[in-house]
Swiss-Prot record:
GO MF terms held by the record: transcription cis-regulatory region binding
Biological processes, Gene Ontology terms: mitochondrion organization; positive regulation of transcription by RNA polymerase II
SUPFAM superfamilies: Ankyrin repeat
Keywords: Acetylation, ANK repeat, Nucleus, Repeat, Transcription, Transcription regulation
Protein name as it appears in the record: GA-binding protein subunit beta-1
Cellular compartment(s): Nucleus
Function: Transcription factor capable of interacting with purine rich repeats (GA repeats). Acts as a master regulator of nuclear-encoded mitochondrial genes.
Species this protein is from: Bos taurus (Bovine)
Length: 383
């Protein structure tokens, strides 16, 4: 039996989960070949849930991060199908948990897409980056929201809060964790941003932003300025942390009977803003987002539950526009290609018509010659 045949049989044995057959074929020198899609025996064993076959192939030295023609690894296959045990054995053998396929989707994206909660938890346990975005600017959390899977969304949201966003695609994203003390330094003294409920984490970027404690603390810190009978003075207060944070600067300006809080950073999303305690707030508060988003005004006498609906981040808008442009370009190219094929077909048809006309003319001439020869022969016989 040739090596090509041995390789084909190894693929079929891996697909069927025939461990003994896999061992025999490898002992006889079967190569670790792939099919026309680049699928290896390990891909097939992982896809079809054959745990023992997967272990046999891994011990034999099959590449744990082999790629198909669309850059999918065995881990992608197992995660997509929900085979948690195979996902774990691949990760224990050193498979790349953050490997991306042609769509820039990781195993976590695919497990979330198919609602495999056990696999999602396992991937997070082994260090999967929950901030990674696909080619369509979607994180695993975005996919869970799109699919309406609240349980997965909660798991992923907790993981995002516990992970520092080191995604190179979002360099402006800054995360300040609750463990990092935050203070405001200004004329009103040093104010700790942590409120009685312990809400002190402020996260800038694509995740939710908690600003309730910040608003209350800023208003309380600047209250002496607004109650003073002296000439209004513009006071600037800055947020400092125990660690250096360059991306988040908050300013409070008290002038003209209002308190204006400006959060200076890139790509801030302000989610649902619930009620703010009335204690310590004597004047309206205006929150201005720096990227052209809405302004929220909370009167001191009528503080109610407000919801600010912000536009999509510039990065996501740009990504969507790029995808739309690519789709339009692809449609234009497809129409042009079809038009070229149609023109070519018309030219071929015209050429065939001309050839047919020429053949008909030749046939007519030949028929006339035959008739002339027949008349001549008839005349000779009559003579």
């Amino acid at each position: 039996m040739s090596l090509v045949d041995l390789g084909k049989k190894l693929l079929e044995a891996a697909r069927a989960g025939q461990d003994d057959e896999v061992r025999i074929l490898m002992a006889n020198g079967a190569p670790f070949t792939t099919d026309w899609l680049g699928t290896s025996p390990l891909h097939l064993a992982a896809q079809y849930g054959h745990y023992s076959t997967t272990e046999v192939l891994l011990r034999a030295g099959v590449s744990r991060d082999a790629r198909t023609k669309v850059d999918r690894t065995p881990l992608h296959m197992a995660a997509s199908e929900g085979h948690a045990s195979i996902v774990e054995v691949l990760l224990k053998h050193g498979a790349d948990v953050n490997a991306k396929d042609m769509l820039k989707m990781t195993a976590l994206h695919w497990a979330t897409e198919h609602n495999h909660q056990e696999v999602v938890e396992l991937l997070i346990k082994y260090g999967a980056d929950v901030h990674t975005q696909s080619k369509f600017c979607k994180t695993a959390f975005d996919i869970s929201i799109d699919n309406g899977n609240e349980d997965l969304a909660e798991i992923l949201q907790i993981a995002m809060q516990n992970q520092i966003n080191t995604n190179p695609e979002s360099p402006d994203t800054v995360t300040i964790h609750a463990a990092t003390p935050q203070f405001i330094i200004g004329p009103g003294g040093v104010v700790n941003l942590t409120d009685e409920t312990g809400v002190s984490a402020v996260q800038f970027g694509n995740s939710s932003t908690s600003v309730l404690a910040t608003l209350a603390a800023l208003a309380e810190a600047s209250a002496p300025l607004s109650n003073s009978s002296e000439t209004p003075v513009v006071a600037t207060e800055e947020v400092v942390t125990a660690e250096s944070v360059d991306g988040a600067i908050q300013q409070v300006v008290s002038s003209g009977g209002q308190q204006v809080i400006t959060i200076v950073t890139d790509g801030i999303q302000l989610g649902n803003l619930h009620s703010i305690p009335t204690s310590g707030i004597g004047q309206p508060i205006i929150v201005t987002m720096p990227d052209g988003q809405q302004v929220l005004t909370v009167p001191a006498t009528d503080i109610a539950e407000e919801t600010v609906i912000s536009e999509e981040p510039p990065a996501k808008r740009q990504c969507i526009e790029i995808i739309e442009n690519r789709v339009e370009s692809a449609e234009i190219e497809e129409r042009e290609a079809l038009q070229k094929q149609l023109d070519e077909a018309n030219r071929e048809a015209q050429k065939y018509r001309q050839q047919l006309l020429k053949k008909e003319q030749e046939a007519e001439a030949y028929r006339q010659k035959l008739e002339a020869m027949t008349r001549l022969q008839t005349n000779k016989e009559a003579v």
